[in-house]
């Protein structure tokens, strides 16, 4: 079986020309632009404005949710120490969400995710008072729907935090499972982040940013050299095979140079480093025919 069968393409017009199949390579980079299928569009990475985060109109809804969440945090005042922990919370959210947030089509785009979150979090700290008036102007139906969504998200976060409370990557699992990107409820995230701060942020600082291992020595855990294995089972370096098997097996690397590799096969007696039998067979296959798999006179 050869690749020749893939190069055959029957023409529909005249069957006489079909009798001899021509070699027509497929062009994967086309000459003209209109032959291409429509390409997948990716979101443009922009740090200027948060409304251009996704390239489509989703960011306005995300901003409304962020306003809602920030105002509800002010009204509830569940975390009195939220001002002290706000920087650490935002850092932890940026770290975890930028690694686990999926971009368009399942591809991880950490740059856009972190930039979008930073741009969405800046107004939460700066201009809360202006957003209260903006929130009062919103319709009551939108507020009720968003409150229901936030309650559901907070319940999901609490359940996941109950299961993953002790593991070091609990906030990563939360942000990966529950939500996508900027749509997560700030309340649920702040609760989970403050609960898991003792584990997650400390674990990240101890590891030096390496989240895969739990070693406290900074960075990834180095694999120790297998001392006992090299001490017990490996043979000494001079021998290649153990003396029991010397009769059965052929020793390959025992001598410095093996004269069996010097083979004078060609007529001129030129030495070759190794026997070229496979190459000679392939070359003799291509003798008398051209390398494109159909010579002109083969079929006449």
Swiss-Prot record:
Keyword Glycoprotein: yes
Motif residue range(s): Integrin-binding motif: 272-274
Superkingdom of the organism of origin: Eukaryota
Glycosylation sites: 94, 164, 169
Single Gene Ontology BP annotation: bone mineralization
InterPro entries: IBSP
GO cellular component, one term: extracellular region
Modified positions (Sulfotyrosine) in chain numbering: 299-300
Residue span of region Disordered: 41-258
The keyword Phosphoprotein belongs to this UniProt entry's keyword annotation: yes
Compositionally skewed regions (Basic and acidic residues) per UniProt: 125-136
Compartments where located: Secreted
Any Pfam family: BSP_II
Biased composition (Polar residues): 93-102, 161-173, 193-202, 229-243
Compositional bias annotation for Low complexity: 46-58
Modified residues (Phosphoserine): 46, 51, 59-60, 82, 90, 139, 266, 293
Biased composition, class Acidic residues, residue ranges: 59-92, 137-160
Other noteworthy facts: It is possible that the segments of clustered carboxyl groups mediate the strong binding to hydroxyapatite.
Subunit details: Monomer. Interacts with integrins; the interaction promotes cell adhesion.
PANTHER family: BONE SIALOPROTEIN 2
Function: Binds tightly to hydroxyapatite. Appears to form an integral part of the mineralized matrix. Probably important to cell-matrix interaction. Promotes adhesion and migration of various cells via the alpha-V/beta-3 integrin receptor (ITGAV:ITGB3).
Domain note: The Arg-Gly-Asp (RGD) sequence serves as an integrin-binding motif and is required for integrin-mediated cell attachment.
Protein name, as recorded: Integrin-binding sialoprotein
Organism encoding this protein: Sus scrofa
């Amino acid at each position: 079986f050869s690749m020749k069968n893939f190069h055959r393409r029957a023409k529909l017009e005249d069957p006489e020309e079909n009798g001899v199949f021509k070699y027509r390579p497929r062009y994967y980079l086309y000459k003209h632009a209109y032959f291409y299928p429509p390409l997948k569009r990716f979101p443009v990475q922009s740090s200027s404005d948060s409304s251009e985060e996704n390239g489509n109109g989703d960011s306005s809804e995300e901003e409304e949710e962020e306003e809602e969440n920030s105002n509800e945090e002010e009204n509830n005042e569940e975390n009195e120490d939220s001002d002290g922990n706000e920087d650490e919370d935002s850092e932890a959210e940026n770290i975890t969400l930028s690694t686990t947030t999926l971009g368009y089509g399942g591809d991880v785009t950490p740059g856009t995710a972190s930039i979008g979150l930073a741009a969405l979090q800046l107004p939460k700290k700066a201009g809360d008072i202006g957003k209260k008036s903006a929130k009062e102007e919103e319709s009551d139906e939108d507020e009720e729907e968003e409150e229901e969504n936030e309650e559901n998200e907070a319940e999901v976060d609490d359940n996941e935090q109950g299961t993953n409370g002790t593991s070091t990557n609990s906030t990563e699992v939360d942000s990966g499972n529950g939500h996508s990107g900027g749509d997560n409820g700030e309340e649920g995230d702040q609760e989970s982040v403050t609960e898991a701060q003792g584990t997650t942020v400390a674990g990240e600082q101890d590891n030096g940013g390496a989240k895969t291992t739990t070693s406290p020595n900074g960075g990834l855990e180095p694999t120790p050299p297998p001392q006992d294995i090299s001490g017990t089972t490996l043979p000494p370096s001079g021998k290649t095979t153990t003396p029991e098997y010397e009769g059965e097996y052929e020793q390959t690397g025992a001598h410095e140079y093996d004269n069996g590799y010097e083979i004078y096969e060609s007529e001129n007696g030129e030495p070759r480093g190794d026997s070229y039998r496979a190459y000679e067979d392939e070359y003799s296959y291509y003798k008398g025919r051209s390398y494109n798999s159909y010579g002109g006179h083969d079929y006449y």
